[in-house]
Each structure stands twice: as structure tokens, then as C-alpha cells.
């Protein structure tokens, strides 16, 4: 193959240049949702930290407990915690919600209002299962089937999935084909 003088390095490797361009455009134009699953409580239920790579804004899904582990991860990643998302109000998923919301001054989003009686019973649930005392809270926003929730520049669709609890919801990200399902 002949060398042509004056060509840019990428002209010698068109496939590399094309791939670099595609990935650079992807980073500039389209936000990507990232997540880390953190098992919490004696039940080791899946709490997830979600964040947008463009804004570094984060949400915590189902902070059932072990708040130091959750906030430690968020701090290490340099994320800005903006909200709590709840799939349902059982103690292992919602036990740390009131404390985290108060400490971080962030809103609580979800679940569906069908779980109001579970929220009201969180203090009793924590005693029954030997969890740290759970505070009572009122969500800033109840969720319904077809709603969307924003994490930074990323959107999650909401599906109401009663069964495990009357107000259980699921959060779905079509861009990463991942659902955050609680106990469904």
C-alpha cells in the first residue's frame, strides 16, 4: 500500500475514524443511563443508584437501608443525588426512605398510592423484622401507569404492576433495555 503525504492520521484508518466519530457523537448528543446495584438490608434486596452520564444527576431506587453504603457510592462517583424512586413500600425497599430524603433534602417519587397503607405501617414493619426504625413519609409524587420519571436527561417509563403490593410500580429504561422491578 502506498503512503500518501499530507493525509491526516485518520485518513489512513477510515474504520477507526468512523468508529471514533460515532462514539463521540453518541456522547455529545444522547444521554446514557448508568446504574449500580447495591444489595442492602439483611434481606440483601437490590437497591439501585441510577445516573445520567451527561449531568451526573442521580436517583436511588428502593433505599431499604444501609444508607451509608448508598451515599458512599454516590460520593465516590461524584454524583448529585436528586431524588428517591420507590417501586413499593415494603420495609426492605422503603425503610431508609424518610431518613435519606430528610438528610439529602430530596423528593420521594412513587410508588402508586395503592401502597399508602404500607407506608403508614413502616414503623411497625421495622420493629417486626428487626430493622432500624423507619420514619413515616408522604411521597412528593404518586406514580401511575404510563408516567415518566426523569433522571438527568434520561427518561424512565413507569408501569403500575399491582400484585406483590397494590401500589407496586416498575421503572423501565428503553435505551439500556433495563427494568428496575422491585419484587415483581
Show the residue positions of the predicted features:
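Short hydrophobic alpha-helical segments enriched in small aliphatic residues
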Residues: 3, 9-11
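Active-site HxH/HxHxD metal-binding segment of metal-dependent hydrolases
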Residues: 6, 65-149
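Tryptophan (W) side chains
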Residues: 17-18
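Serine residues within intrinsically disordered or low-complexity segments
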Residues: 21-24
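Conserved beta-strand hairpin/beta-sheet module of binuclear metal-dependent hydrolase folds
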Residues: 31-77, 170-184
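Divalent metal-coordination and catalytic microenvironments
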Residues: 50, 62, 88, 100, ...
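Metallo-beta-lactamase
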Residues: 124-125, 148, 154-184
Amino acid at each position: 500500500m502506498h503512503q500518501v503525504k499530507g493525509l491526516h492520521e485518520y485518513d489512513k484508518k477510515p474504520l477507526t475514524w468512523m468508529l471514533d466519530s460515532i462514539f463521540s457523537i453518541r456522547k455529545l448528543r444522547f444521554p446514557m443511563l448508568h446504574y449500580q446495584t447495591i444489595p442492602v438490608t439483611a434481606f440483601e434486596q437490590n437497591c439501585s443508584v441510577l445516573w445520567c452520564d451527561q449531568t451526573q444527576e442521580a436517583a436511588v431506587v428502593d433505599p431499604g437501608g444501609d444508607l451509608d453504603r448508598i451515599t458512599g457510592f454516590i460520593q465516590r462517583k461524584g454524583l448529585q443525588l436528586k431524588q428517591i424512586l420507590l417501586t413499593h413500600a415494603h420495609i426492605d425497599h422503603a425503610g431508609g426512605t424518610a431518613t435519606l430524603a430528610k438528610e439529602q433534602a430530596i423528593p420521594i417519587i412513587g410508588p402508586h398510592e395503592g401502597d399508602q397503607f404500607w407506608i403508614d405501617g413502616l414503623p411497625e414493619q421495622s420493629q417486626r423484622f428487626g430493622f432500624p426504625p423507619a420514619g413515616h413519609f408522604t411521597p412528593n409524587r404518586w406514580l401511575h401507569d404510563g408516567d415518566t420519571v426523569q433522571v438527568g436527561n434520561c427518561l424512565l417509563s413507569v408501569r403500575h404492576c399491582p400484585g406483590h403490593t397494590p401500589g407496586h410500580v416498575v421503572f423501565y429504561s428503553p435505551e439500556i433495555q433495563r427494568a428496575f422491578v422491585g419484587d415483581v
